[in-house]
Design a protein with these regions (language model features):
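Surface-exposed, low-hydrophobicity segments enriched in Gly/Pro/acidic/Ser residues
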Residues: 1-171
Length: 171
């Protein structure tokens, strides 16, 4: 699929992981069939809460760039393991973050990530206070290709975080 530069809508379309980015072309190589063993079965999409009062669906969120990635953007931070699909055990980030009490305390998380793990805010992680969970009507998900399209363009200072579950070949 080729998109002309003037047809692309910046800051609206996002792959859920590198796996989907890396496998997109092979998945759509034989239209109209989609050749993907993965189907997203559940997703939550969180965004910076700008101008909307907090509600029951708002919560504090920390999003990690390399969580669940087999191939990490910053291999010096997390050792890579061999597993083709995104998973919390694809690298040791989830285990380290889950075990660290200071990260699980939202108020001390940034300091701990920066000082202890040498992570960079805005690169390795983003902390979103009072993030708003998007309603299903605010985005479209392509469950086999692993990307979402927001109904509106994100502003440059907004942050998006996702949590999702999937099956591979139905299991």
């Amino acid at each position: 699929v080729y998109i002309k530069a003037d047809d692309y809508d910046d800051n609206r379309h996002f792959f859920l992981s590198q796996y989907f980015t890396n496998n997109y072309n092979s998945a759509v190589a034989s239209p109209p069939l989609i050749n993907s063993p993965v189907i997203i079965t559940k997703i939550e999409v969180w965004i910076t809460n700008v101008g909307i009062s907090a509600n029951a669906e708002a919560r504090n969120v920390i999003g990690f760039m390399d969580l669940g990635e087999t191939t990490t953007y910053d291999p010096t931070l997390i050792p890579n393991l061999i597993d083709p699909y995104p998973d919390n055990t694809s690298n040791d980030l989830y285990g380290k973050m889950n075990a660290d009490v200071d990260i699980r305390k939202y108020t001390s998380a940034s300091g701990q990530l920066i000082n202890t793990y040498k992570y960079s805010a805005g690169t390795n992680f983003n902390k979103i206070e009072n993030a708003r969970k998007l309603r299903d009507s605010e985005y479209i998900i392509h469950p086999q290709l692993g990307y979402i399209s927001l109904n509106r363009r994100m502003e440059d200072d907004e942050v998006l975080a996702v949590a999702y579950q999937y099956t591979v070949r139905g299991s």
